[in-house]
Each structure stands twice: as C-alpha cells, then as structure tokens.
C-alpha cells in the first residue's frame, strides 16, 4: 500500500493537470462541434453561478474577483498575478494559458478568454455585478463591478 500513499503535493499536481486537460478538451469539443465556445461556456457558467450564492446578494466585487483568481489558480496553466479594487469594483489579472497547453490540446487563447468571460459573466450577473474582460500584455483582466 505504500506505493499508493501519495503526498498532498502529488495529488494537487495531478488534479491541476486533469482539470486543465478537461478544460481544454471542453474548449476544443465546443469549437469542433459548434464552431464557437459560446454555448458550452454559457452552459458551464449557468451551472456554476448558483454555487456562488453563498456570497450573498450584496457580494463584494473584491471578494468575487479574489475567488475568480482562486478558481483559475487551481489550473496548471493560468496564474492570478494581481488583485486590486474594493467592494464596488475590483480587478484580477490572470497570466496564461501556457502555450504548451494550447498546442497540446489544439485550443486557442481567444477561445480560452471567451469561455472565461462567459463563465465569470454568468457568476457576476447572478451576484448583481457586471464583468468586463480584456487581454493585454499583462494577461486576462477580469473587472467585476456592482451595478
């Protein structure tokens, strides 16, 4: 049984890789099936958004942005690098996805960004917020703002 005693670090690394592979496979499947990731990402966002209800009706934009960063930090190819703002407006900047993953799974940065935009927009709207998503040299910017 000693061979099956995995360290927390081994388990985390394996889980991050598996999660990232499933993400990229979902992107590629949607692109090949529908020509776009929009329907798939919209569905994923609708399914995940209720799990953020525990934040309450007046959720802090800063907390929503922080949790978005946490979710993306659990992947093997994206890293939150900056969090700023306050309860009414907050921004998280995400580096990635890594080119290695895009090449290996035949996905694109544009599809990845679009899917994240649609998923986090569904979450933001359910929390009474707007989401602005844009990419520049620093990475993918997700800006959450109270309405």
Predicted segment positions?
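N-terminal accessory segment detector
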Residues: 1-91, 98-115, 133-147
């Amino acid at each position: 049984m000693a061979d099956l005693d995995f360290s927390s670090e081994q388990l985390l690394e394996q889980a991050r890789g598996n999660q990232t592979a499933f993400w990229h496979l979902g992107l590629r499947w949607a692109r090949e099936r529908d020509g776009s990731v929009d329907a798939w990402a919209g569905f994923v966002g609708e399914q995940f958004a209720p799990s953020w209800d525990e934040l309450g009706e007046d959720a802090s934009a800063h907390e929503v942005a922080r949790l978005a960063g946490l979710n993306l930090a659990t992947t093997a190819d994206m890293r939150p690098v900056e969090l700023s703002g306050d309860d009414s407006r907050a921004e998280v900047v995400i580096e990635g996805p890594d080119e290695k993953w895009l090449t290996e799974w035949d996905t694109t940065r544009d599809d990845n960004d679009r899917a994240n935009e649609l998923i986090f927009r569904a979450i933001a709207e359910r929390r009474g917020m707007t989401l602005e998503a844009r990419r520049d040299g620093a990475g993918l910017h997700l800006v959450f703002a109270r309405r």
